[in-house]
């Protein structure tokens, strides 16, 4: 009988302290998430120093809670996986140092995991990954299209040239007057409004899979400023609808085109913006028309969590990709350089 593989995973790349125990690469035995949203809300965004302090305060209790929820001891764990980057360096270091301490104290292998690889592997929890596939990455810091021909094989075929989609959502939300985090609130408003503004769709070069959202963001902000200066009433829901439709149309079109060009029948979506209802519906509609299998994680697995790190860590464990105790956090890591090839 094959022995179960248990991975203890740690995620502290931004403003969630999360620890999870994953069995055999898919089964979530525990997934504890300590959110900092309320602490950052008054600042209108994540403050790195505040995030780091909260990670320090919460990491030990979160580890203990995850082990308790999974009903396992640290001795039962086969390896420790941890997000090494990209992310906020101070936040990353809390998780990395905690993982190194556990690996040293209990003589466990240490597995460094790329944060975006984790988001990709959140899909594996919902439905086993089959290859080749296209992954659409949409988050506060990243907007990418990635071609994968096998596990841990990443070829970035498109990326944002300026703002990430989640960043654009947050800035538009602030301009409208919505509280942090703005993305979910824009999505909610968009369901109530009408597409009354002609905001731009930025396609860039012909056949390019790159993205650009700074022009769209500026167009929305300028429109709102002009209306306020002229005392023209603003229907916030219509602004949200028009903005979101512009974003979703571009993301959907390029994702579907990438699937067609690369001859794949599997599209997965990863990152916090993957929980956006408008995007999920648009992709579902177009994948159905084009006979493409679509997988999007449940909303709780779209945002940062350690379960996704544990799943990616499982496949790194199988490949023997371990780190020594000199492992450090990195604010930027290229996904392709992290690829198994």
From Swiss-Prot:
<keyword id="KW-0963">Cytoplasm</keyword>
<dbReference type="InterPro" id="IPR000905">
    <property type="entry name" value="Gcp-like_dom"/>
</dbReference>
<comment type="similarity">
    <text>Belongs to the KAE1 / TsaD family.</text>
</comment>
<dbReference type="Pfam" id="PF00814">
    <property type="entry name" value="TsaD"/>
</dbReference>
<keyword id="KW-0819">tRNA processing</keyword>
<dbReference type="GO" id="GO:0005506">
    <property type="term" value="F:iron ion binding"/>
</dbReference>
<protein>
    <recommendedName>
        <fullName>tRNA N6-adenosine threonylcarbamoyltransferase</fullName>
        <ecNumber>2.3.1.234</ecNumber>
    </recommendedName>
</protein>
<feature type="binding site">
    <location>
        <position position="119"/>
    </location>
    <ligand>
        <name>Fe cation</name>
    </ligand>
</feature>
<feature type="binding site">
    <location>
        <position position="183"/>
    </location>
    <ligand>
        <name>substrate</name>
    </ligand>
</feature>
<dbReference type="GO" id="GO:0061711">
    <property type="term" value="F:N(6)-L-threonylcarbamoyladenine synthase activity"/>
</dbReference>
<dbReference type="InterPro" id="IPR022450">
    <property type="entry name" value="TsaD"/>
</dbReference>
<dbReference type="GO" id="GO:0002949">
    <property type="term" value="P:tRNA threonylcarbamoyladenosine modification"/>
</dbReference>
<feature type="binding site">
    <location>
        <position position="170"/>
    </location>
    <ligand>
        <name>substrate</name>
    </ligand>
</feature>
<keyword id="KW-0479">Metal-binding</keyword>
<feature type="binding site">
    <location>
        <position position="187"/>
    </location>
    <ligand>
        <name>substrate</name>
    </ligand>
</feature>
<feature type="binding site">
    <location>
        <position position="276"/>
    </location>
    <ligand>
        <name>substrate</name>
    </ligand>
</feature>
<dbReference type="InterPro" id="IPR017861">
    <property type="entry name" value="KAE1/TsaD"/>
</dbReference>
<keyword id="KW-0808">Transferase</keyword>
<keyword id="KW-0408">Iron</keyword>
<feature type="binding site">
    <location>
        <begin position="137"/>
        <end position="141"/>
    </location>
    <ligand>
        <name>substrate</name>
    </ligand>
</feature>
<dbReference type="GO" id="GO:0005737">
    <property type="term" value="C:cytoplasm"/>
</dbReference>
<comment type="function">
    <text>Required for the formation of a threonylcarbamoyl group on adenosine at position 37 (t(6)A37) in tRNAs that read codons beginning with adenine. Is involved in the transfer of the threonylcarbamoyl moiety of threonylcarbamoyl-AMP (TC-AMP) to the N6 group of A37, together with TsaE and TsaB. TsaD likely plays a direct catalytic role in this reaction. Critical mediator involved in the modification of cell wall peptidoglycan synthesis and/or cell division as well as in the positive regulation of the activities of different murein hydrolases. Essential for cell viability.</text>
</comment>
<feature type="binding site">
    <location>
        <position position="115"/>
    </location>
    <ligand>
        <name>Fe cation</name>
    </ligand>
</feature>
<keyword id="KW-0012">Acyltransferase</keyword>
<feature type="binding site">
    <location>
        <position position="304"/>
    </location>
    <ligand>
        <name>Fe cation</name>
    </ligand>
</feature>
<dbReference type="InterPro" id="IPR017860">
    <property type="entry name" value="Peptidase_M22_CS"/>
</dbReference>
<dbReference type="InterPro" id="IPR043129">
    <property type="entry name" value="ATPase_NBD"/>
</dbReference>
């Amino acid at each position: 009988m094959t022995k179960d593989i248990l991975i203890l995973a740690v995620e502290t790349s931004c403003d969630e302290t999360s620890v999870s125990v994953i069995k055999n690469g898919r089964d979530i035995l525990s997934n504890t998430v300590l959110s900092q949203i309320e602490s950052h809300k008054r600042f209108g965004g994540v403050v790195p120093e505040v995030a780091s302090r909260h990670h320090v305060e919460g990491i030990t209790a979160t580890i203990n809670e995850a082990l308790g929820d999974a009903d396992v001891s640290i001795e039962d764990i086969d390896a420790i996986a941890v997000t090494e980057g990209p992310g906020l360096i101070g936040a990353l270091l809390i998780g990395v140092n905690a993982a190194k301490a556990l690996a040293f104290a209990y003589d466990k292998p240490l597995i460094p995991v790329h944060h975006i690889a984790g988001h990709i592997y959140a899909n594996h929890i919902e439905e086993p990954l089959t290859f080749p596939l296209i992954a659409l990455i949409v988050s506060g810091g990243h907007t990418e299209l990635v071609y994968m021909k096998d596990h841990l094989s990443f070829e970035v075929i498109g990326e944002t040239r300026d703002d990430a989609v989640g960043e654009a959502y947050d800035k538009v939300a602030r301009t409208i007057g919505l509280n942090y985090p703005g993305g979910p609130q824009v999505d909610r408003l968009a369901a109530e409004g009408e597409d009354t503004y002609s905001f731009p769709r930025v396609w860039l070069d012909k056949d390019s899979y790159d993205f650009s959202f700074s022009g769209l963001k500026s167009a929305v902000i300028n429109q709102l400023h002009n209306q306020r200066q002229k005392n023209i009433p603003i229907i916030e829901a219509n602004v949200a609808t028009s903005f979101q439709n512009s974003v979703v149309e571009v993301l959907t079109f390029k994702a579907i085109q990438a699937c067609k060009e690369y001859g794949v029948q599997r599209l997965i979506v990863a990152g916090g913006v993957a929980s956006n209802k408008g995007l999920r519906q648009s992709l579902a509609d177009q994948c159905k028309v084009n006979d493409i299998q679509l997988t999007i994680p449940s909303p709780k697995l779209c945002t940062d969590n350690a379960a996704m790190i544990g799943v990616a860590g499982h496949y790194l464990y199988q490949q023997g990709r371990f780190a020594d105790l000199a492992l450090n956090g990195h604010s930027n890591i290229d996904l392709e350089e992290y690829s198994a090839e």
